[in-house]
Amino acid sequence: HSFSRRQRQMCIRDSFNRVYEGIIRKGKLGLPNGIMTFSQTPQPDLVEAPFAAEWSVDFLAESLKACTHVYYGDDNNGTTDAIGLDDYLKSLGDVTYGEGLHDDIAAQLISAATAIASLEDPLASFVVEQQAASFEVYAELQALVVLWKVDMMSSLGVLITYQDNDGD
């Protein structure tokens, strides 16, 4: 079965959003620091690699770096420039929803990486002892969700549905 270019783009974007929002933002920080629960009680046992305490923050940072590579179309660990999601935005030729949005996303990627760098290992202890600081990092990651999932998808004309809409 052959997919059209638009179908391939939609698959990439949908997968990208699921990985970033569900696995990275929520799974690696939102659940452990408790922001995803009604009581906002930290759940340090949910950090990634709980038995390798010195790696949890590194895994979060590397995950954001991987999403950054996908956004920019970086190949071979950032040494080769291929077509990325940023290129689709720039191709719109619109100052506000193309280049301007790309600039906002680029700035937020830097802010999110800087925020992650402020976390300390072991992350399981950090989310308990400095929960408010971990919430601030989460807020930086959440800002990317809005830029990617709402603004970028809207600019590119992609409809994200959470259930089938085929009419049956």
Regions found by a protein language model. Name each.
Residues 24-168:
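A cross-kingdom marker for long, charged
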Residues 1-12:
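Single conserved hydrophobic/aromatic residue that forms the stacking wall/gate
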